[in-house]
Amino acid sequence: MVNYRMIELFIKTYIQMGILEMKKRIFALLLSASMLFALTGCGEDSELEIYRKEVESFYADVIEINDNINAIDAESENAPQKLLNELDSLNERFQEFGELEVPEEYIAVESLADEAASFMNEAVSLYHSSFSEGTFNDFSVGMAYEKYCRAILRINYIGDILQGKTLEGENINIHYEDEEE
């Protein structure tokens, strides 16, 4: 018999690590993005203003889903299903975020959002397969967590870009528009 409560706690811990890192950046991101978009936007319905609202909504929804995950009673018989439902909601928001129209000024964000959506979709699929048929597959959980971390990393990169920061790190290549190829 699989101990789903322990598995659910294990998965929640990994998910919280990624979300907590993202939560640290959200306030600064929203403040910076609001100020940046306010300075560059020229009307209430400008493309930048619409995008800003969508980004804020996305981050607020991610925080709410994280809070829902944290509120799951690990002793509950249906805890694994509740966790998977919340992960499905998270995946849905990532997919919607990946489909957003990105303003020209932030076109670099578009591919990152698409990658984040793809990685989150793979992660949630692997989390579901980890619980399939009453068995637990720790390899699938490990792979799911890796995909999850990649999705969160790209969301963090998006936050940095919207704050005007220059991305740094391994495997990051920056190409400027005025460079000749």
Residue ranges and their predicted role:
Residues 43-45:
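Bacterial signal peptide processing site
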Residues 24-32:
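Sec-dependent signal peptide recognition
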Residues 38-41:
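C-terminal motif of bacterial Sec signal peptides marking the signal peptidase cleavage site
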Residues 21-22, 151:
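Short alpha-helical segments used as structural interaction elements across diverse proteins
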Residues 47-180:
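Alpha-helical segments in soluble extracytoplasmic regions
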Residues 1-21:
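Short, Lys/Arg-enriched N-terminal segments with co-localized hydrophobic residues
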Residues 10-13, 29-30, 170:
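Intrinsically disordered, low-complexity segments enriched in polar/charged small residues
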